[in-house]
Amino acid sequence: MFQLGKSEKAFEEAKRYMPGGVNSPVRSYRSVGSNPPFISSASGSRIYDIDNNEYIDYVLSWGPMILGHANPEVIASLQEAIPRGTSYGAPTLLETELAKKVQAFMPSMEVIRLVNSGTEATMSALRVARGYTGRDRIVKFVGCYHGHSDALLVKAGSGLATFGVPDSPGVPQGVAENTITLPYNDSDAVRKLFDDIGDTIAAIIVEPVAGNMGCVPPEPGFLETLREVTKAHGALLIFDEVMCGFRASSGGAQKRYNIKPDLTCLGKIVGGGMPLAVFGGAREIMNQIAPAGPIYQAGTLSGNPIAVTSGLATLSILQRDPTIFKQVEDATIALCEGFERLAAQYNVPVVVQRVGSMFTIFFTDKPVKNFDDAASCNEEQFKMFFHHNLSHGIYYAPSPYESNFVSICHKSSEIERTLAVADEAFKKIGDTLKNSDTLKNSDTLL
């Protein structure tokens, strides 16, 4: 029988030592009105908590584990590397090898800098854009999350959306004034802004596939508009592919939609589950970074051999067997088509949105194209779906504003089990809707 007694005790203790008991807000389960399971181990498509519950995992550490948890080849490479030392603070051959592999997947990244997190990657890319153009203003889109640096915590998605906070206290007004926000997928708003002040803008930064208000793909022509206006006005186009890199396709969203950005930020999969991210782009731009140029960026643990080893092993597997990308996308398609079929069977209004191997179930009857659309979805129905699945061994992101992910370890048996539990959840929601309609009709008759 499903129970979380040990996890609840562990959470109470954690709250004495960490803000809210967690090290990233969405993990607190506050948005679904419960307490989180504390995870003890993971393998393949499964994770296990300290209460001995087993789950089929669609969070996958928020995206990185495309090969599944504890991939034997990745683990073996780490076991071999660790005895040689965990950090040198000096150049290694591994860094160059990783840069070569990243460039092979994404040729737009001619020169690459390794950092420790997606936040560092986007923060550094913005500094490079400002230094290169000599301009201060940046454009981002409402609901797109680019990490927690001050300039980008303005109308962000992800955890901020989960907690209903449009902006974070502690971001100086002077910093926020240089961040212009527009609705995602609104090409007309982009054109108008650039017609008015385009020559003062350093860069547009965008999730080419939004993943932090749920999975929201770009509308036809949207990314093309961004590329067109930035080129016309001497601004840079930055693709934040921290989430959708290696998910949208083998070459990320830029390959899937055939758009070449000036700078790209990658994380998650590129580190194979270790703290590693990269940013890179055109040689002329990246060579403005110290020591090649005047724009400063540095990090004590950047390029540390353990994280680089994990990333190198992961990308080597993906490079050796490119069919992995089709396999995970095919599994995601089967899963999403199953969700749509079951929801329709029980008359539950649902829109399932997918790009590559990332997906979100939106409890709404219309496509989600931007943050306002995402925010109008039915959160109570999401909570019902989430809790039924969790208690029956299916682990989804505990927020309606997040993407879920599929790995190479999610085989047909996992998909079948997932859909069987989803069938029960949608039936429960459908029955609730039916009873609600019956009650309304009774009230009308009275």
Can you describe what each PLM-predicted range is?
Residues 1-435, 439-446:
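Conserved N-terminal phosphate-binding loop of PLP-dependent enzymes in the Aspartate aminotransferase
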